[in-house]
């Protein structure tokens, strides 16, 4: 029987659970004295803020939610996408967080909007049960199309993510020193969400060498001087979203940049199994390489 992961309720260790419980007390107090908006909306928002609080307790060990920063929302969005939350759930939770932040005296207008956070409306059929992974041919089709329309950079970003399993923000943060490390050590050290540091193995240096040759010392690999990272992220996401018919094989499936991590996970897991590792051993390695350190996450990626 296939194991079912409850994406809305994950286990915490005792210390983190205590932090989360204290946050919930704070949240309930705020909503108990709040009369703004409809009751059902407040009820849904309270649930959304508690989901955010659980993430904040787990990833940042935050004792209160009075000082929400952009980095917290970027990490939270990545987490929700990793867990397979629908876009409607993500946007509602973000609205809940902004509502709550205003209630505790913060200014939600200073927080990044959904566009900056990379939240793009996708198909109504989006759900955790769908296999979000790209296929080999879809990746090649995308790279070819991107090159044909003068967006070779997008093709390189997609190929690199499929080879290394990097998040889009991690791809955009790469600089020449990362590439030098890859060429010398066959690995790249990545600082991911929540400050987690991991080593990602490099098995094919072809693209790495090309990017190294084309990147000036001290510069980012994919972000040109004067460019804003969040705009590059938004642009490639929209490019993928708007050109599905040019590279996707299944017209009823919505491919996203995040789906490249699913592609990496499935292929890397298969590769490790073929080298004699057990399923559990392979999952541990893949989970670590994806930057999760939580094996049950691979259930979502291997779907």
Language model features with spans:
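N-terminal core-binding DNA-recognition domain of tyrosine recombinases/integrases
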Residues: 27-127
């Amino acid at each position: 029987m296939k194991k079912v992961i409850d994406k809305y309720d994950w286990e915490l260790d005792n210390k983190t659970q205590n932090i989360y419980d204290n946050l919930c007390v704070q949240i309930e107090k705020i909503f108990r004295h709040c009369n703004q908006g409809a009751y059902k909306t407040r009820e849904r928002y309270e649930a959304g803020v508690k989901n955010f609080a659980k993430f904040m307790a787990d990833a940042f060990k935050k004792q209160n939610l009075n000082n929400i920063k952009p980095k917290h929302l970027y990490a939270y969005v990545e987490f929700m996408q990793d867990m397979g939350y629908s876009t409607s759930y993500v946007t509602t939770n973000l609205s809940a967080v902004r509502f709550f932040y205003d209630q505790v005296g913060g200014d939600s207008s200073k927080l990044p909007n959904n566009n900056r956070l990379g939240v793009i409306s996708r198909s109504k059929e989006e759900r955790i049960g769908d296999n979000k992974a790209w296929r080999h041919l879809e990746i090649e089709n995308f790279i070819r199309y991107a090159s044909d329309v003068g967006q070779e950079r997008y093709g390189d970003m997609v190929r690199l993510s499929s080879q290394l399993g990097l998040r889009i923000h991690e791809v955009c943060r790469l600089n020449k020193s990362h590439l030098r490390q890859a060429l010398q050590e066959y690995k790249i050290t990545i600082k991911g969400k929540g400050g987690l540091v991991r080593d990602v193995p490099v098995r094919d240096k072809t693209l790495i060498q090309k990017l190294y040759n084309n990147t000036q010392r001290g510069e980012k690999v994919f972000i040109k001087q004067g460019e804003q990272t969040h705009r590059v992220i938004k642009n490639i996401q929209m490019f993928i979203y708007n050109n599905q018919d040019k590279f996707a094989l299944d017209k009823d499936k919505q491919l996203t940049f995040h789906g490249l991590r699913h592609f990496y996970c499935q292929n890397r897991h298969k590769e490790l199994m073929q080298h004699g590792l057990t399923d559990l051993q392979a999952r541990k390695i893949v989970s670590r390489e994806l930057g999760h350190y939580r094996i049950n996450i691979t259930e979502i990626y291997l779907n």
